[in-house]
């Protein structure tokens, strides 16, 4: 059995066990409902588990053939091989999966016997599939390990690690936005860019990416969003452009990352075709299934004041008027409506991110797990939850007392 299929089979088994423990029928019904389907069409639990496992493999390891962009166009394999040692990689927010490291290497790192200042060490980590979201082909050329191809996966931006081994090194946390990652700084290293291009990308800053920049030439990045807690939410992007994850996954895979396939968006007069072979479409169902299985993380024990959070819930539903839009179990009205740009606390901005989208509007962001991913608002203009509350209080003339504002922050931290 090929290694990739063996990994999928193993992961399918991991998914089937909890489904069986919870009751297969209920689990299947919940999965179908989450995908916008109908329980009238029975779905085999084992098949769904395999689909989720395949999606996990896609999320972590599939580049959709984007090596043609990152290698052939941007020449990032040359940059990595010559200038990106592990310490440099960690400094721009790249993460290392400690579970991909053999025990002997872990011991050597702990003993200080591994040189983390040499690009050759990065190549060794790539050979192990240990650099989260980066897929490299390392071949021996004239007796020397050589990085010949490099591509990226969904996990680059939408996964991080728990830092259990060291900062930036630990177990994967899929779905968690990597707000340490500085994709603009990484792209700016490309020798294929001119000075203006390098400056534009370098201006983004950590945790931000502009998914329209290479389409409309404008430069106004947004924060990397979570890829968890999306079960049951149909408008999955800041601007609600598509009604399912597969829409945005295709757009990013092809239009942004250079994956081999086609994406069309008539509302933007957009048609992008990379290559003649479609390496994207067949992977979208599994990828979506896996992402919908990712739950928002619960807040750490002791991270908020329980009594204050209870009072804050009353503020959230009352004086703060938050539940007017942040409603329902997902704390969003995104399945019902979108909002004009003027409703956004990040607007007015220039250029307006909404104006560059297909809907020209914003969705209400879901709040589960909000404690985990500062900064806030789509442009990252609020550094803390206290800043979020203060902004709403001022812009909406809510007249919250200091105690109400503080309690509301504690409630948000509890979600």
For the regions a language model picked out, list residue spans one by one.
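Intrinsically disordered, low-complexity, compositionally biased regions/tails
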Residues: 10-11, 27-29, 38-43
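N-terminal secretory signal peptides that target proteins for export/translocation
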Residues: 1-16
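C-terminal motif of bacterial Sec signal peptides marking the signal peptidase cleavage site
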Residues: 32-34
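Electron-transfer interface patches adjacent to heme c in soluble/periplasmic c-type cytochromes
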Residues: 38-56, 61-309, 313-415
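Long, compositionally biased, charged low-complexity segments
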Residues: 8, 18, 47-51
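Sec-dependent signal peptide hydrophobic core
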Residues: 16-27
């Amino acid at each position: 059995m090929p290694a990739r299929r063996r990994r999928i089979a193993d992961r399918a088994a991991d998914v089937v066990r909890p489904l069986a423990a919870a009751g297969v029928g209920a689990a299947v019904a919940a999965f179908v409902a989450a995908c916008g389907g109908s329980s009238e069409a029975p779905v085999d639990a084992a098949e769904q588990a395999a689909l989720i496992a395949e999606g996990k493999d896609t999320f972590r390891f599939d580049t959709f053939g984007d090596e043609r962009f990152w290698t052939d166009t941007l020449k990032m394999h040359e940059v990595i091989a010559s200038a990106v040692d592990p310490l440099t990689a960690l400094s721009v927010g790249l993460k290392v999966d400690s579970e991909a490291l053999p025990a002997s290497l872990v011991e050597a790192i702990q003993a200080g016997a591994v040189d983390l200042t040499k690009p050759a060490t990065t190549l060794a980590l790539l050979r192990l599939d240990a650099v989260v979201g980066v897929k490299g082909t390392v071949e021996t050329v004239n007796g020397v390990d050589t990085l010949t191809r490099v591509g990226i996966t969904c996990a680059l931006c939408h996964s991080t690690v728990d830092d259990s081994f060291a900062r930036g090194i630990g177990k994967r946390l899929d779905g968690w936005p990597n707000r340490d990652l500085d994709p603009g700084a990484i792209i700016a290293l490309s020798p294929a860019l001119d000075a203006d291009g390098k400056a534009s990308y370098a201006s983004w800053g950590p945790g931000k990416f502009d998914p329209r920049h290479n389409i409309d030439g404008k430069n106004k990045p947004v924060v990397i969003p979570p890829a968890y807690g999306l079960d049951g939410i149909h408008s999955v992007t800041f601007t609600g452009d598509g009604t399912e994850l597969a829409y945005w996954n295709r757009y990013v895979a092809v239009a942004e990352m250079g994956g081999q396939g086609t994406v069309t968006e008539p509302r933007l007069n957009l048609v992008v075709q990379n290559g003649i072979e479609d390496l994207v479409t067949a992977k979208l169902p599994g990828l979506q299934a896996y992402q919908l299985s990712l739950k928002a993380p619960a807040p750490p024990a002791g991270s908020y004041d329980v009594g204050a959070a209870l009072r804050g819930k009353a503020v959230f539903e009352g004086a703060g008027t938050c539940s007017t839009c942040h409603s329902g179990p997902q704390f969003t009205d995104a399945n019902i409506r979108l909002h004009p740009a003027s409703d956004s606390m990040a607007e007015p901005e220039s250029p307006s991110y909404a104006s560059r989208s297909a809907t020209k509007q914003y969705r209400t962001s879901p709040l589960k797990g909000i404690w985990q991913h500062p900064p806030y608002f789509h442009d990252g203009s609020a550094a803390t939850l206290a800043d979020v509350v203060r902004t709403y209080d001022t812009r909406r003339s809510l007249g919250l007392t200091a105690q109400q504002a503080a309690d509301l922050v504690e409630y948000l931290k509890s979600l």
